[in-house]
Swiss-Prot record:
Part of the RNA polymerase complex. It is found in: Cytoplasm. Keywords: Cytoplasm, DNA-directed RNA polymerase, Nucleotidyltransferase, Transcription, Transferase. Its EC number is 2.7.7.6. It comes from Thermococcus sibiricus (strain DSM 12597 / MM 739). PANTHER family: DNA-DIRECTED RNA POLYMERASES I, II, AND III SUBUNIT RPABC1. GO terms for biological process: transcription by RNA polymerase II; transcription elongation by RNA polymerase I; tRNA transcription by RNA polymerase III. Belongs to the archaeal Rpo5/eukaryotic RPB5 RNA polymerase subunit family. This is DNA-directed RNA polymerase subunit Rpo5. The gene is rpo5.
Amino acid sequence: MTAKKSLTIFDHVLVPEHRVLSKEETEELLKKYNIKPSQLPQIKTSDPAVQALDAKPGDIIEIKRKSPTAGVYYYYRIVVED
């Protein structure tokens, strides 16, 4: 008998890597860019990536994107309620 492999949204080639920042990383990010959490782009709790990470409103998500010109760059979003 073969076991079925459980796939996640992150297994798809077009979905970039996501992760929830720790409290310390969040503080460093906000201090580095001299911003408030409300100044970050938003991502809703209904987003499949947010649900897969079990992120809560107020968490900051780091998205690692690949670019043919910039190489790898990071994008940050704050989780908000729908």
